[in-house]
Amino acid sequence: MPNMKVHIQFPEDKIKEPVIYQIGHEYKVVTNVRRADVRVTTGWMDLELTGDSTEIERAIVGLRKKGVIVDPIELNVVE
């Protein structure tokens, strides 16, 4: 099954929202947090999304619509 690794950054107003939970329920993707650093005012996460390629792309668009910055991780650097 296809997967994609992304680096996401949360602005302060999104830190307390269950964004990853929501994405896992709104789209047919499995989320796997590989690394993270979440503080009171900001946070980042390396996230692996697994599922159909179309659903992965929809989930990324959904994250961006929620105000989260999403960048692809090149060369599987979280391994």
Regions found by a protein language model. Give the residues of each.
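Long, contiguous binding/interaction regions
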Residues: M1-E79
